[in-house]
Swiss-Prot record:
Name the UniProt record assigns to this protein: Bis(5'-nucleosyl)-tetraphosphatase, symmetrical
Record bears the keyword Oxidoreductase: no
Species of the source: Nitrosococcus oceani (strain ATCC 19707 / BCRC 17464 / JCM 30415 / NCIMB 11848 / C-107)
Cystine pairings recorded for this chain: none
GO molecular function: bis(5'-nucleosyl)-tetraphosphatase (symmetrical) activity
Protein role: Hydrolyzes diadenosine 5',5'''-P1,P4-tetraphosphate to yield ADP.
Organism ancestry: Bacteria, Pseudomonadati, Pseudomonadota, Gammaproteobacteria, Chromatiales
Gene (UniProt): apaH
Length: 278
């Protein structure tokens, strides 16, 4: 069985299918790890989510920020934004089945045999992998429970700007969500800067660094695979971490990384681009 991790698809169904051909994906034997943001900005979000849903256990998918946004829109808690491409999902006859499936996806997946953790965005430096798993399970229980809409109503916002173990209520759950689905930069004390999205080296605010470069982060030494950051160059980084978001929807590449080999193998498909980075 081959295991491939794939970066942010964001509704780029045609490129997704091209990449599956490139890796010779066998639906009966292989497994996909999808780093979140299945939907939005690309033209075929409905086709992507239906296809992944249909793969069943052959696909392991973690939630990204665009996936959570879809849940909030479907719940009537957020309007469709001008750049959203979610209307086809919202009007689909199988809408409720897809939305229910989506909110039951994990926020973090760890394969202990391979020693690899899959997330969408990042981990604050205070979290080791056990803490990250515990926090992910905490929020997943809410999203999968009867009060999932209540969390989504309180999800949006950039504060608190730092993880603390004594956080409670919506602030705690929002911070967990922001770390796992939005985090790119923080400072040496673990304070987040969620608004800044550019590539490393362009920081205008002193002290900011990619989350995986914070000195003495508790998860250092763990192999972590993530997406979310289209302006970060794809590839392995010290840590060790592997960045998979090639910015497909922006005209970059859709990226796959084979994980079950001793030396990871990379695969790329060029994308025509459907939106502009903002």
């Amino acid at each position: 069985m081959a295991i491939y991790a794939i970066g942010d698809i964001q509704g780029c169904y045609d490129e997704f299918q091209q990449l599956l051909k490139e890796i010779h994906f066998d639906e009966q034997a292989d497994q996909l790890w999808l780093a979140g943001d299945l939907v939005n900005r690309g033209p075929k979000s409905l086709e992507v989510i239906r296809f992944v849903h249909g793969l069943g256990k052959r696909a392991i998918t973690v939630l990204g920020n665009h996936d959570l946004h879809l849940l909030a829109v479907a719940a009537g808690l957020q309007p469709l934004h001008s750049k959203d491409t979610l209307a086809a999902i919202l009007s689909a006859p199988d809408r409720e089945e897809l939305i229910t499936w989506l909110r039951h996806l994990p926020l973090l997946y760890r394969n202990s045999k391979l020693g690899i953790t899959l997330i969408h965005a990042g981990l604050p430096p205070q979290w080791d992998i056990a803490t990250a798993e515990s926090c992910a399970r905490e929020l997943e229980a809410v999203l999968q429970g009867p009060n999932w809409r209540d969390f989504l109503a309180h999800m949006y916002g950039d504060k608190p700007v730092q993880w603390r173990d004594d956080l409670k209520g919506w602030e705690r759950l929002r911070t967990i969500s922001n770390c796992l689905t939005r985090l790119r930069y923080c400072d040496a004390k673990g304070r987040f800067s969620l608004k800044f999205k550019e590539s490393p080296g362009t920081q205008t605010k002193g002290g900011l660094m990619p989350w995986f470069k914070v000195p003495h982060r508790a998860s250092h030494g763990e192999r972590i695979v993530f997406g979310h950051w289209a302006t970060l160059e794809v590839g392995p980084y010290e840590g060790p971490v592997f960045a998979l978001d090639g910015g497909c929807v922006w005209g970059g590449q859709l990226v796959a990384l084979r994980l079950d080999k001793e030396e990871p193998q990379w695969f790329f498909v060029d994308c025509q681009g459907y939106s502009k980075i903002t």
